[in-house]
């Protein structure tokens, strides 16, 4: 399924996206913000691409003006620890995303997430959307807040804290 915004087409990953995806992950700061290892070989990036490609709701964000892959967005079953998940209705989804560095801070991800929120709202198929971010990732926190997500707590994976944002639909 494709989603359209004013400037983007959100479509499933395809093999033609692999090289641009790997190139996009070369940025160390993007990897830090997303939680990827600081050092990421091309083979590991290819493995991540293939893993994401198996999910039917991994979207490539394609800029309409030139057909360039500018990032990705995953829309997967809610991935939250039980102590948070049990306080929410069943059937929520988690959004995870990255905008490649040359295209950040231009509103593209806001458009993409808004399209996914609207699609789920219209379909009435999920009760909530979840997004998580690291405490140092203030741009993601501002993005979620601006889209109507509210702070819902935090959890840890190993020794890493994730702040959780929820948007009830």
Region roles according to the model:
Residues 1-29, 58, 62-169:
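Acyl-donor (CoA/ACP) binding surface of acyl/acetyltransferases
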Residues 52-54:
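Soluble sensory domains of the PAS superfamily and closely related sensory modules
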């Amino acid at each position: 399924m494709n989603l359209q915004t004013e400037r983007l087409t959100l479509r499933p990953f395809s093999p033609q996206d692999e090289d641009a995806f790997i190139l996009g992950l070369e940025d160390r700061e993007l990897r830090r913000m997303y939680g990827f290892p600081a050092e990421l070989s091309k083979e590991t990036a290819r493995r991540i691409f293939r893993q994401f490609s198996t999910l039917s709701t991994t979207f490539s964000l394609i800029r309409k003006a030139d057909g360039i892959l500018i990032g990705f967005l995953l829309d997967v079953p809610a991935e939250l620890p039980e102590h948070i998940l049990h306080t929410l209705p069943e059937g929520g989804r988690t959004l995870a995303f990255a905008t490649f560095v040359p295209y950040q801070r231009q509103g593209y991800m806001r458009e993409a997430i808004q399209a996914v929120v609207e699609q789920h709202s219209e379909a009435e198929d999920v009760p909530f959307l979840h997004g998580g971010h690291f405490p140092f990732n203030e741009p993601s926190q501002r993005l979620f807040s601006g889209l109507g997500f509210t702070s819902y707590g935090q959890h840890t994976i190993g020794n890493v804290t994730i702040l959780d944002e929820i948007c009830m639909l």
